[in-house]
């Protein structure tokens, strides 16, 4: 009888990937990136281990959503104080902090526990085309062509 092999933490080979978010649909980009962060693109995927790779997302300020979402999609946060609820539309948040839109979409697709927080730390999002991770030589990650907004 064959036994299932579980990769050790030392044997996990982490790659760096670069994703250009320009003219990409938010949800379709987020699902692909979340899958790579979890390690589901590897043969050594194990649900209870962080086998994922690092992902650098650039041009977060040029991400797209469909329909009326730019005016109707709301992002909520709370300061923890009474009356501390803040509500912002997609358009306003994109002008102020475009990285947060991509981060929030991807974080919601990762496990909601300590392992998910560890996976989320491997995500790096930047609003422009520049990023400080050139030394890691990130490879371009090919996304599904359907993810490109028309």
Swiss-Prot record:
Keyword set includes Cytoplasm: no
Residue stretches spanning the membrane: none
Matching InterPro entries: Ribosomal_uL13, Ribosomal_uL13_bac-type, Ribosomal_uL13_CS, Ribosomal_uL13_sf
Annotated GO biological process: negative regulation of translation; translation
CDD domains (UniProt xref): Ribosomal_L13
Pfam family, any one: Ribosomal_L13
Keyword Cytoplasm in record: no
Family matches, as HAMAP family: Ribosomal_uL13
Organism domain of life: Bacteria
Subunit text: Part of the 50S ribosomal subunit.
Name by which UniProt lists this protein: Large ribosomal subunit protein uL13
Taxonomic classification: Bacteria, Bacillati, Cyanobacteriota, Cyanophyceae, Synechococcales
NCBIfam families per UniProt: rplM_bact (TIGR01066)
Stretches for region Disordered: 129-150
One of the record's GO molecular function terms: mRNA binding
Record key words, sorted: Ribonucleoprotein, Ribosomal protein
PROSITE patterns: RIBOSOMAL_L13
UniProt record similarity statement: Belongs to the universal ribosomal protein uL13 family.
PANTHER family: LARGE RIBOSOMAL SUBUNIT PROTEIN UL13M, RIBOSOMAL PROTEIN L13
GO CC, one annotated term: cytosolic large ribosomal subunit
Annotated function: This protein is one of the early assembly proteins of the 50S ribosomal subunit, although it is not seen to bind rRNA by itself. It is important during the early stages of 50S assembly.
């Amino acid at each position: 009888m064959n036994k299932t092999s579980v990769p050790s933490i030392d044997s996990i080979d982490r790659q760096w990937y670069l994703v250009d978010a320009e003219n990409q649909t938010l949800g379709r980009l987020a699902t692909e990136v979340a899958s790579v962060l979890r390690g589901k693109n590897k043969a050594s995927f194990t649900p209870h281990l962080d086998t994922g790779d690092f992902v650098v997302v650039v041009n977060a300020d040029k991400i797209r959503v469909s329909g009326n979402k730019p005016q109707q999609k709301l992002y909520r946060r709370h300061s923890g104080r009474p009356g501390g609820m803040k509500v912002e539309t997609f358009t306003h948040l994109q002008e102020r902090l475009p990285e947060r839109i991509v981060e929030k979409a991807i974080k919601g697709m990762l496990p909601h526990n300590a392992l998910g927080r560890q996976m989320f730390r491997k995500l790096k999002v930047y609003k422009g085309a520049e990023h400080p991770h050139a030394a890691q030589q990130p490879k371009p990650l090919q996304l599904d062509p359907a993810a490109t907004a028309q």
